[in-house]
Regions:
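Juxtamembrane/interface segments at transmembrane-helix termini
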Residues: 85, 233-235, 257-261, 300-314
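Short, membrane-exposed interhelical loops at transmembrane-helix boundaries
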Residues: 194-197, 263-283
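Long, contiguous internal "core" modules enriched in hydrophobic/ aromatic residues
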Residues: 51-235, 249, 253
Length: 325
């Protein structure tokens, strides 16, 4: 997950540098909190069973629990701001005003002292964060069912998957309902941004292929839950694929069809769109060429995971001191 987050940030930096500077530079409290919980996860995995560690194994287990809850909760909340908006302003005149002054030029500024943590006060953001947390728990249980060769652990994972999956479905459906009936920010041909009621619902209606992708993703996740409930080991493949399709459809809905993908709550005209925040044409062309390698990278990832998971993990390997992650 941490590697995916870093890749996500790097891709956004290259393609949408203004979003990168605005979100990562303005909402840095929430991004630093996300970074911290993943750092303590890595430290916990490395040292929890090292002989002579001064904190003890239970302390590192608490670190893992913090990461398992706070990590996806904060990530989901941060992603939710792509639809609900954030408190920032953008003033491109600072580029001209700062030219030749010898000082750093800042064109986007955060308007609250909480620097992103205020997203936790929005019900829609929190619902998405909770849904992501329970989805992570559901997929984790499905992964254990598929990759651990132990009947006791398989049954325990199946039993724990069911309540997590039910909670995920409830919170995700509630969040999706709020999204479809929420106001969005639309951009016209002149670049002016205005509020459009039911904007995201209109996006799915006007782009039915996105609605189909979203439906396929949701059905795949629900199918994986049904398979997991019956104790099928292959549930994770449907759950993982369905999650990717669902996230893809939602992110495209946030930015396509003349939609501001990062609305500003402080100044509507500062909202970020694909048109006003993308990188140079040359950079986008280079990234388009490089993106042709994505199918090969995806195939390699599939092959590598398939090779690692070909032999199920045993209880003895889990109890061992060697690296098993």
């Amino acid at each position: 997950t941490f590697t995916t987050l870093v890749t996500f940030g790097g891709a956004f930096f290259a393609s949408f540098p203004l979003f990168y500077s605005t979100s990562f530079g303005g909402a840095f409290y929430v991004w630093m909190a996300i970074l911290l919980v993943f750092v303590i996860q890595a430290v916990a995995y490395e040292y929890r069973r090292k002989p002579g560690n001064v904190f003890g194994e239970k302390t590192f287990n608490v670190f893992l629990m913090i990461n398992g809850i706070a990590g996806p909760l904060l990530l989901g909340t941060a992603v939710g701001t792509l639809f609900t908006g954030a408190n920032f302003t953008v003033d491109r005149l600072n580029l001209a005003n700062g030219a030749g002054s010898g000082s750093a030029t800042v064109i986007s500024q955060w308007t609250t002292p909480w620097h992103g943590l205020e997203a936790l006060t929005d019900v829609s953001n929190v619902f998405l964060g909770i849904a992501v947390t329970f989805l992570a728990a559901t997929l984790a249980c499905q992964y254990f069912m598929n990759n651990i060769d132990d009947k006791t652990i398989l049954e325990r994972a199946r039993q724990r998957m069911i309540p997590a999956a039910v909670c995920f479905v409830l919170f995700f459906v509630a969040w999706l309902g709020m999204l479809l009936f929420a106001d969005g920010r639309a951009v016209d041909a002149a670049g002016r941004i205005s509020i459009e009621p039911y904007k995201y619902l209109h996006n799915f209606i006007e782009m039915p292929y996105l609605a189909v992708v979203l439906l396929l993703g949701v059905v795949a996740v629900l199918w994986s839950i049904g398979l997991g409930w019956r104790g099928r080991r292959n549930a994770i493949w449907f759950g993982g694929a369905g999650t990717v399709l669902t996230v893809l459809a939602l992110l495209l809905c946030a930015g396509w069809n003349d939609t501001a993908y990062y609305p500003s709550l402080a100044d509507m005209q500062s909202s970020l769109t694909i048109y006003n925040s993308s990188s140079s044409l040359f950079t986008l062309k280079v990234m388009s060429i490089v993106s042709l390698l994505i199918p090969f990278v995806a195939a390699y990832i599939w092959y590598a995971w398939r090779a690692m998971n070909r032999k199920p993990i045993t209880r003895e390997e889990i109890r061992g001191d060697d690296h098993q992650y």
